[in-house]
């Protein structure tokens, strides 16, 4: 059995802590034979435990404490602490591991409630579960999610060589916004969501780049951001935004412009990797 969970890109500009999309990088968990102890084989970051201390197993045991230990093989091309939902993918995989091994028969909505309680907000875990574009909210123990197709566009991701942890990225945000600022910020977010749902990427792109909630505070933490945005816009992009808490920079591109923008960014002397990504429409799935 193999559990597959997509990467996710959250916020998408003004959709702060509430909007995310599933993308074509993946965490895969191969569930192998029963074992005396939990064993997680991987060639990932050496900081990631290879026993029951692994977050994947911790999550599974929270839901089903009596499941028999297994040998697991973990592979992932979702980079750690880069704003592509690496921790959310593990949380969703852990829930699915318990769901499969303990035969919990959880619905997607039940998975979402559990994942949101663990993660604190649904913007990454929701698209990891459902796939596609998800607009979600969590308030007073109530979680809501609306799943929609993402408009016809490509994603070009610049993933820097350096990490930017969410806690650091949140420290630069203001403690409060004035009433006037909040109204302006929410109106921009409303336009961005409406345009995405309608499929109008030109209007969506302008709104995405006009965010007032977080981007202007975080952009100075990512030294390549302004150059990428300038080059992408000059060559016909819809928008450039910070993926999640960063430092990944995401360019939304018309499909006929993607190759030009991708090649142009490849020629720059940026210290990181550049990928063309597509929307994942399935979310978490199990191959048996």
UniProtKB/Swiss-Prot annotation:
Catalytic activity line of the entry: L-homoserine + ATP = O-phospho-L-homoserine + ADP + H(+)
Keywords associated with the record: Amino-acid biosynthesis, ATP-binding, Cytoplasm, Kinase, Nucleotide-binding, Threonine biosynthesis, Transferase
Gene Ontology BP annotations: threonine biosynthetic process
Pathway the protein contributes to: Amino-acid biosynthesis; L-threonine biosynthesis; L-threonine from L-aspartate: step 4/5
GO cellular component terms, A-Z: cytoplasm
Enzyme class: transferase
Protein name, per record: Homoserine kinase
Organism: Streptococcus sanguinis (strain SK36)
């Amino acid at each position: 059995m193999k559990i597959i969970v997509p990467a996710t890109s959250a916020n998408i500009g003004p959709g702060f802590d509430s909007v995310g999309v599933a993308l074509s990088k993946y965490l895969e968990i191969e569930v192998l034979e029963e074992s005396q102890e939990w064993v997680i084989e991987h060639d990932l970051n050496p900081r990631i435990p290879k026993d029951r201390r692994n977050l994947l197993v911790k999550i599974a045991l929270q839901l089903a404490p009596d499941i028999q230990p297994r040998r697991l093989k973990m592979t992932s091309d979702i980079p750690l602490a880069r704003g592509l939902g690496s921790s959310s993918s593990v949380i969703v995989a852990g829930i699915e591991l318990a769901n499969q091994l303990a035969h919990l028969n959880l619905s997607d909505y039940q998975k979402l409630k559990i994942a949101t309680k663990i993660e604190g907000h649904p913007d990454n875990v929701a698209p990891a579960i459902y796939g596609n574009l998800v607009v979600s909210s969590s308030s007073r123990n109530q979680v809501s999610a609306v799943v929609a197709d993402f408009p016809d566009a490509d994603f070009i991701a610049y993933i820097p060589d350096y990490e930017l942890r969410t806690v650091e990225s949140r420290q630069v945000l203001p403690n409060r916004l004035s009433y006037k600022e909040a109204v302006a910020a929410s109106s921009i977010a409303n336009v961005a969501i409406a345009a995405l749902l309608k499929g109008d990427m030109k209007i969506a792109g302008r709104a995405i780049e006009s965010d007032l909630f977080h981007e202007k505070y975080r952009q100075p933490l990512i030294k390549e951001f302004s150059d990428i945005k300038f080059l992408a816009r000059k060559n016909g992009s819809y928008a450039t935004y910070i993926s999640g808490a960063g430092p990944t920079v995401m360019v939304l591109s018309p499909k006929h412009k993607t190759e030009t923008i991708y090649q142009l960014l490849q020629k720059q002397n940026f210290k990181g990797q550049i990928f063309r990504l597509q929307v994942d429409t399935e979310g978490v799935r199990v191959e048996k």
